Design a protein with these regions (language model features):
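ABC ATPase NBD coupling module
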Residues: 69-83, 107, 112, 228-232
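The feature captures the beta-strand-to-loop junction immediately N-terminal to the Walker
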Residues: 38-40
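Conserved ABC ATPase signature
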Residues: 136-141, 145
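Conserved catalytic motifs of ABC-family nucleotide-binding domains
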Residues: 158
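ABC ATPase "signature
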Residues: 222-223, 231
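Helix-to-loop junction immediately C-terminal to a conserved catalytic motif
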Residues: 53
Length: 252
């Protein structure tokens, strides 16, 4: 098996004494793999994402990114090697669509023509023809279109790791299902590792090859969607996945 792109080993994180947000958190994400973090609010999902890009530092344990301790590279350099997709795309409102997609390549010093070619290719990939959308501004886009731009921006510098925090949570159900299907198609052509946080277990089942169920800062089970349905580790996992026992389209 290829070396993990992202690995947590026995990680602990607290914001107040005696109240761990993450405890003995151990998880690895391999190249080309999508792993979803699910669980109730406050279970530590977003904290794990922030540890991966050093918006937070662990109190104990180790976090490795790209085969080295996460504290080794300078934080800005680390973050430029990671793609991010968040709710509503997180676009810069006064930048055009193309300027938004070019954000990280611009920071990395790519020449203008290379940035343009990459941005236009990605806009085509996410279903936004550049001739129609490159010069638009975020306010001129629908929610689904903004989210597609957010995905294109995350992939612009071909990062080996993509972090997704509730990326499609603000979309209506029809738009959400459409972009989920498109994400699966895009993902097949990428080698990036993806760590996805979502409150929607059906979304995790559709998009992720493996799912980690968190509760009170601990991982209760890591497995495929089928593992969670058929072999839940305990009563909490069983109840958590109960409403999703009917087959759904999955990433596997």
């Amino acid at each position: 098996m290829a070396a993990a792109v992202l690995e947590f080993v026995g990680v602990g994180k607290s914001f107040a004494p005696g109240a761990p947000v993450l405890e003995d958190f151990t998880l690895a994400v391999s190249p080309g793999e999508t792993v979803a973090l699910v669980g109730p609010s406050g279970s530590g999902k977003t904290t794990a994402l922030k540890l991966a890009n050093r918006l937070l530092d662990a109190d104990s344990g180790e976090v490795h990114v790209f085969g080295e301790p996460v504290r080794a590279p300078e934080p800005a350099a680390l973050r430029r090697r990671i793609g991010y997709v968040i709710q509503e795309g997180g676009l810069f409102p006064h930048w055009s669509v193309r300027e938004n997609v070019e954000t990280v390549p611009r920071l990395l010093g790519w020449p203008d023509e290379k940035r343009r070619v990459r941005a236009e290719a990605l806009l085509e990939t996410v279903g936004l023809p550049p001739g129609e959308f490159s010069a638009r501004f975020p306010r001129e886009l629908s929610g689904g279109q903004r989210q597609r731009v957010g995905v294109a921006r995350a992939l612009a510098a071909d990062p080996p790791l993509v972090l997704m925090d509730e990326p499609f949570g603000a979309l209506d159900p029809i738009a959400r299902r459409a972009i989920q299907r498109e994400f699966l198609a895009w993902k097949r052509s990428l080698s990036a590792a993806v760590l996805l946080v979502t409150h929607d277990l059906s979304e995790a089942f559709r998009l992720a090859g493996r799912i980690a169920v968190l509760h009170r800062g601990r991982i209760l089970q890591v497995g495929t969607p089928d593992d969670l349905r058929r072999r839940p580790a305990d009563a909490f996992v069983r109840e958590f996945v109960q409403e999703f026992v009917e087959p759904v389209e999955t990433a596997t």
